[in-house]
Amino acid sequence: KEITIPRFEASQGEVYQDFPLTYEVAGPRLGTAPLVLVNHALTGNSSVTGEKGWWNELISEAGAISPKHYTILAFNIPGNGYDGRESPRADRFSLKDVAELFLLGLDQLGVKELYAIIGASMGGALTWQMAFLRPQLAKIIIPIACDYRASDWLLTQTLIQRQILANSSDPLRDARIHAMACYRTPQSLNARFTSSRASDGSGSYAVEQWLRYHGDTLKKRFLLSAYGVMTHLTATIGVCAEAEELTRITSDIHLVSIDSDLLFTHDRAQATYEALVSHKANTYFHTIHSIHGHDAFLMEYEQLNRIVQPYFPTPL
């Protein structure tokens, strides 16, 4: 589905008329059930549940969030390519601009309040940003495996990604190969591959075959321009300067962190929680224990469902 934002002024001062915003709704129609907004991550999209759903293990009848009892809404981040449109420039928006657009999208749909906003990775940062801009919008927010501000380590990785995109002869494939190393951990890869050789007889290592597979797979389903946009947006995460400023958010805040995350590190999530909880009692901290690093939010579904489910009760 698509709506049009009549007028939008980006933080760089550019004014857009009739800006298209695409989205999907699952479950009961808007206005008839508690509404959950799901913000997608870097290579994600609005298909969060159902036949093409990339988060079905969490958002389904078998998962923690039931689309039978909750209306599920997800927008596409402009430029992610899922609507078939290519972005002319990677740097035209910041993540704050995306949050502003999503809020205008909610206004267009007549949405005054949300039961919850949930998102992981960049989608989690977007969750922080939306709640910061409209502190009373949601009853609950669940930012997963993310940060309210880009760390120097994250900025290091996004610069490497941009350099690969600019200089590689096979930019999308090579950028994805590097990104996979950020999304996993040494312990995860060592345990899985044990320095074994690939099964294809090429003589290469199994881990090399696996990395190339992920690079090739993304090339088939993702636009190079979209990857550039999403990488740029990741580097613009900056809700506020200090965590204490997040106390303006009235929602119950459930921070979910992964103890082995190399991209959005566990210690920073803990520091954010500690800065908040002394001023805001309805702040809670949950840990996913895993050797798999950042991608654990897409792998450790038993733990994630156990963490999230209590806040999404379904009537008997």
Please give the residue ranges for each predicted region.
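Alpha/beta-hydrolase-fold enzymes
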Residues: 137-217
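Catalytic-loop region of hydrolases
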Residues: 1-35
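Catalytic active-site module of serine/aspartate enzymes centered on a nucleophile-bearing elbow/loop
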Residues: 270-316
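Conserved acidic catalytic loop of the alpha/beta-hydrolase fold
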Residues: 96-115
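Conserved alpha/beta-hydrolase "acid-adjacent" motif
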Residues: 262-271
